[in-house]
């Protein structure tokens, strides 16, 4: 076999690196045995070495202008040693035989914006473990995680970063290998196998990707030749002091080419279906987490990072050019406009989706309130619809919300044991009916009371308790209802898909609204955020006919109180909230219910007689 060791760098390399050699198993780590040749004024070094076996370890030995020699991991390595070791490994990335042609055909025929997107966010090392504490491999995850996700009705798996990283405590968000799948769980083709298996089961795969910053580990990208190569030299624009990381120099062509190549690599070689770009806000603002005097304004005196904006626009343009069916998702927490505008214009960034952090913060605050006080905060419940269609939003309840003392989802709920379960069911049923794609971090679906611990597996033993099994069943059923009913997902991004029925019943903390499919079929959603039952509650309906309850978060099989609206619900010619007809229903405590039109009357006269 042949090792082609090449490093494409900027002019800094040409000016600063005095020499580069390849060292490894094959030459007993001799710094002077295999020097690379500079083959262009652009700072490209190249070397061919014959007879290097696959999985052999190697590094670059880079000589700085001060004649210091530093061992560096190959920035373009496809495979690396498992931490704490950090050498690159020779690996043949091509040759995996894919079986996902039908999946790609399906994606081309079914644009994701009008399809159900319900993401199960996973940390690969702590979803489930062996009894001895060892983590599952990519292939073991394929055997265990994929059937679970399919049975639960989720449409996609999103992994926290699988790009190689040295520090477990970063959860993968401090990356040293932008082309290397972490070896914690196996080799690259094992991850390809996982993605392939997902596609065969109709499940998409999204990867977290971190182009915002990188760690200062000595073997990584930082100070690659002793100076700032991938990062800015000036710490006012080149470092995140709070995170202890470097910031990529987006104004340097070679750096943006490196990052663009990384994103395309995961789409091309690993067939992933989407990329969630982490920490976008930190890229957009030069004063992000900085005090006065700690940052440098742009050429116009502003705080916008114009070269980072240009990079993100290029990223989304290139991805959509070659992978129009791919999902590009921004974790962006500010009010930066047009994050999901595409084609790009007017400072639009070109993402497909943006995490709705405003909705997430408002709703987690609201559901944490004692119900006694919720009527004083009704605007928190309804405010999201003021801006719901300003971007293509995804509603996230992510890993960030169940760590660092924030409490698990079920422990955010006030009240006693039963009330906490009712609170989770009601909140999730409301979330599934709210416009926007969905994301839920692992563990909430089993009612885990403890916060997520990256060092431990989820508390699967909870499923030996009836309440937790019933909650797990609820998640599966509400996920499948969302997936199978077009009104719940087809039209998430304009008012044609959502209409308020009543948003003003603040005294009872009840809201009701319609979700409408392209063909006009619809679901009526009624949400009660008080532990109070209401009989003969009037809800406006759009048509004169017979309605039925098709989902109830308080159903007995889900562990609820079992109060339901059984049988036929006949609409009356009684106007309610701008709708010409209405029906009377029973509203259970803390319940969310879905209704649909079962049939229109044979004759209006016949129904009038029944009234």
Feature annotation, model-predicted:
Residues 2-9, 13, 604-609:
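Single conserved hydrophobic/aromatic residue that forms the stacking wall/gate
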Residues 567-601:
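C-terminal beta-strand-rich structural cap/linker in extracellular carbohydrate-active enzymes
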């Amino acid at each position: 076999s042949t090792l082609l060791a090449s490093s494409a760098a900027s002019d800094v390399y040409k000016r600063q690196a005095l020499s580069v050699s390849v060292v490894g198993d094959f030459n007993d780590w001799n710094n002077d045995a295999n020097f690379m040749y500079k083959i262009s004024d652009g700072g490209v070094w190249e070397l061919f070495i014959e007879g290097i076996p696959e999985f052999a370890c190697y590094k670059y030995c880079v000589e700085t202008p001060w004649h210091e020699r530093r061992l560096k991991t190959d920035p373009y390595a496809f495979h690396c040693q498992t931490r704490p070791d950090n050498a690159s490994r020779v690996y043949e990335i091509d040759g995996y035989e894919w079986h996902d042609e039908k999946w790609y055909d399906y994606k081309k025929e079914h644009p994701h914006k009008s399809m159900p997107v319900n993401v199960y966010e996973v940390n690969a090392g702590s979803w489930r473990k062996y009894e001895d504490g060892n983590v599952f491999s990519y292939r073991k995850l394929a055997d265990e995680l994929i059937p679970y996700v399919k049975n639960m009705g989720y449409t996609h798996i999103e992994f926290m970063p699988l790009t190689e990283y040295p520090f477990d405590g970063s959860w993968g968000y401090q990356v040293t290998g932008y082309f290397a799948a972490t070896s914690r769980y196996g080799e690259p083709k094992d991850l390809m196998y996982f993605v392939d298996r997902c596609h065969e089961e109709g499940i998409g795969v999204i990867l977290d990707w971190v182009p915002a910053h990188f760690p200062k580990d000595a073997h990584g990208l930082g100070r690659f030749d002793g100076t700032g190569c991938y990062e800015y030299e000036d710490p006012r624009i080149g470092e995140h002091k709070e995170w202890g990381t470097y910031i990529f120099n987006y104004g340097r062509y070679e750096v943006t080419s490196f990052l663009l190549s990384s994103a395309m690599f995961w789409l091309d070689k690993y067939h992933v279906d989407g990329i969630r770009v982490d920490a976008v806000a930190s890229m957009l603002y030069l004063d992000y987490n900085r005090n006065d005097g700690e940052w440098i304004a742009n050429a116009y005196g502003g705080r916008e990072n114009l070269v980072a904006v240009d990079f993100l626009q290029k990223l989304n343009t290139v991805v959509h050019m070659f992978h129009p069916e791919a999902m590009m998702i921004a974790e962006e927490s500010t009010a930066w406009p047009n994050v999901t505008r595409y084609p790009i214009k007017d400072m639009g960034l070109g993402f497909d989706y943006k995490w709705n952090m405003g909705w997430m913060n408002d709703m987690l605050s609201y559901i944490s309130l004692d119900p006694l006080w919720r009527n004083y905060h009704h605007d928190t419940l309804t405010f999201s619809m003021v801006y719901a269609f300003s971007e293509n939003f995804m509603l996230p309840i992510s890993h960030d919300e169940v760590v660092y003392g924030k409490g698990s989802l079920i422990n955010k709920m006030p009240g006693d044991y039963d009330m906490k379960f009712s609170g989770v069911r009601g909140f999730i049923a409301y979330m599934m009916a709210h416009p926007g794609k969905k994301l839920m971090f692992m563990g909430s679906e089993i009612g885990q009371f403890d916060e997520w611990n990256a060092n431990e597996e989820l508390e699967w033993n909870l499923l030996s308790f009836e309440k937790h099994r019933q909650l797990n069943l609820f998640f599966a059923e509400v996920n499948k209802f969302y997936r199978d009913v077009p009104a719940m997902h087809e039209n998430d991004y304009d008012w044609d898909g959502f209409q308020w029925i009543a948003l003003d019943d603040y005294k009872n903390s009840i809201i009701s609204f319609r979700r409408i499919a392209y063909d006009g079929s619809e679901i009526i959603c009624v949400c009660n955020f008080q532990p109070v039952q209401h009989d003969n509650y009037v809800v406006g309906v759009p048509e004169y006919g017979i309605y039925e309850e098709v989902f109830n978060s308080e159903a007995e099989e889900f562990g609820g109180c079992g109060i339901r609206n059984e049988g036929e619900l006949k609409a009356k010619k009684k106007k309610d909230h701008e709708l010409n007809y209405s029906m009377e229903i029973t509203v259970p405590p803390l319940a969310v219910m879905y209704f649909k039109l079962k049939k229109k009357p044979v004759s209006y006269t016949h129904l009038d007689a029944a009234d």
